[in-house]
Amino acid sequence: MRYREEAIECVKDHVLQIHKQIYAKYEGDFDRIYTEGYNSKSYTGRVIEPGKILIINGSPRKKGLISQMLGIMREEAEKRGDMVEMVYTNDLTVKPCTGCMACRTKGKCVLAEDDSQRVLQMMQQADAIIMGAPCYWGNIPGQMKLMFDRQVYGMMRDTNRFPEPLMKGKKCILISTCTTPWPWNILFKQSRGAIRAMREIARYAGFKIVSTIERGGTVMHPELTEKDKQKCRKAIERLMKVK
């Protein structure tokens, strides 16, 4: 027990010294301490350096709740120093997958190049992905599914045993909304169904899912509450902390 207490005190002292060094370096300027000090490589605490985040908005409604929630996440991430890009699947030009399976052996889609390849490249370059989708028949909207169908070769590779994830090391947040109120949105697998579909894609691709948000009852409660907004901010906070 004595050694454990000594180890804890040693760690506390080390962390305190780091804080003192950063405070002295930036002369007590808390804005610079956060953006430059705690995000620098010299800091060994829990906050991770800024990175690239790609937001995939599966909602066709740019002023809907999904778009609002993703907007809050974007604002919070940019405030913390991340580079953020957003893609609206409804704006993409993507032809349907034909199921020819040629991409599994060639490592690329043999159909004419369109936005599916462009977004895939953005995903490959990102450190984290945020997927947001309203519930359509207990699933994600067709526009979003269409895009992911065409990207499978860049997200997982077939092997003689289990699929090999190609997005390993990247993090992910999933959010969904539906008209069905809580708890029926979960019990009847409405928003939960959309989350399940996105989780399946993320899991086989190798993403580490750090947070999921489900918001039911969008007809009865069409405005975001402060609690909803706080959940979005907390998800970004968790994204920054989880390695």
Question: Where are these predicted regions, by residue range?
Answer:
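Helix-loop-strand module that forms the ligand-binding subsite of alpha/beta enzymes
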Residues: 3, 8, 13-18, 22-25, ...
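Glycine-rich phosphate/pyrophosphate-binding loop and the adjoining helix
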Residues: 14, 18, 26-34, 45, ...
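N-terminal beta1-alpha1 ligand-phosphate binding loop
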Residues: 51-80, 181
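Residue-level recognition of beta-strand->loop/alpha-helix junctions
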Residues: 57, 88, 213-214
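Short, glycine/serine-rich, charged loops/turns that create anion-binding
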Residues: 60-61, 91, 179-180, 217
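A short beta-strand-loop structural module common to alpha/beta enzyme folds
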Residues: 83-93
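Cysteine-cluster motifs in flexible loop/terminal segments that predominantly coordinate metals
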Residues: 93-123
